[in-house]
Amino acid sequence: MKERQRWRPEEDAVLRAYVRQYGPREWHLVSQRMNVALDRDAKSCLERWKNYLRPGIKKGSLTEEEQRLVIRLQAKHGNKWKKIAAEVPGRTAKRLGKWWEVFKEKQQRELRDSRRPPPEPSPDERGRYEWLLENFAEKLVGERPQQAAAAPSPLLMAAPVLPPWLSSNAGPAAAAAAAVAHPPPRPPSPSVTLSLASAAVAPGPPAPAPWMPDRAAADAAPYGFPSPSQHGGAAPPGMAVVDGQALAELAECCRELEEGRRAWAAHRREAAWRLKRVEQQLEMEREMRRREVWEEFEAKMRTMRLEQAAAAERVERDHREKVAELRRDAQVKEEKMAEQWAAKHARVAKFVEQMGGCSRSWSSATDMNC
């Protein structure tokens, strides 16, 4: 479709020239007025101008302050991007909506990654001794399930195969080794009884049953371990007596320990993610509080300016009223003085007339006497 094609620089230049000459309106007349075959409809021209070519639009990614502002406004207004864009200068509603979709998808992906269990560690990561011990225990339990359940026979394991933290040459370890070498008829305790001992410290065991040498030799032959009967019923120097069921329990404990470690690692990652979210929320709240304080300060300043303007207007109004009152008083006084002056002038004129009448009558009287 033509509307989906990428805009070319010459088309943008045509739109800019059209807006400079005719203003951002009547987009359906662009081709007619500019005498250019612009294969774009009016809506496409409007969207191009409003979202990309309009002066004042910022290009590039959002800054951290703009991101915090958009997150706060989205929590306040929802997905009303036109209202949000009105409060974020230089950004359009379309740009903010796309940024929010990418931000939300990134958050969901981080949450899924934090809840996903960690991958299975390689033998190098788990450790050489742990890997050997676990594989040997699984092989032993898998090939001899019935023999381990009916009558567990003692096996001899070389001491170097065990990890260093299982090695011990103390007296209690020797007693534990003797107890493992001659278990009672009932199954052993669920707790792991595994230790190392030497032949010099461990006491000699009693005579084994008639069937024990042949069965022990047959059991130990497939794995390459010598049987106790080959050494007179006692463990050779540097060897440890290990019970098959105890070894399986040890492997199970190791697996449980590894599962606990993985769960702890997952919990730690989730806690770190939650802590990061809390820090972001606190930062947003601090920025919001700072903005609210600034807005409150600006509101107070505007109120003080309005009060100052109102007070100045009141003073000016009182001044105008007093000046008008003084002018009225002066005019009244002037009118009164004019009236008084007119009255005095009338009296003087009357007096002059009276004086003129008296002089005429006096002159006529004198003429008659003569």
Swiss-Prot record:
Gene3D superfamilies linked to this entry: Homeodomain-like
Gene Ontology biological-process annotations: asymmetric cell division; defense response to bacterium; defense response to fungus; leaf formation; negative regulation of DNA-templated transcription; polarity specification of adaxial/abaxial axis; proximal/distal axis specification; regulation of innate immune response
Subcellular location as annotated: Nucleus
Organism superkingdom: Eukaryota
Pfam families named in the record: Myb_DNA-bind_6
PROSITE patterns, A to Z: HTH_MYB
Xref: InterPro entries: Homeodomain-like_sf, Leaf_Dev_Regulator, Myb_dom, SANT/Myb
Domain HTH myb-type: 1-53, 54-108
Tissue expr: Expressed in lateral organ promordia.
One GO MF term: protein homodimerization activity
SMART domains noted in UniProt: SANT (SM00717)
Subunit details: Homodimer. Interacts with AS2, WRKY1, HIRA, a probable histone chaperone, and RIK, a predicted RNA binding protein.
Protein function: Transcription factor required for normal cell differentiation. Interacts directly with asymmetric leaves 2 (AS2) to repress the knox homeobox genes.
Name of this chain's protein: Protein rough sheath 2
Species of the source: Zea mays (Maize)
Gene behind the chain: RS2
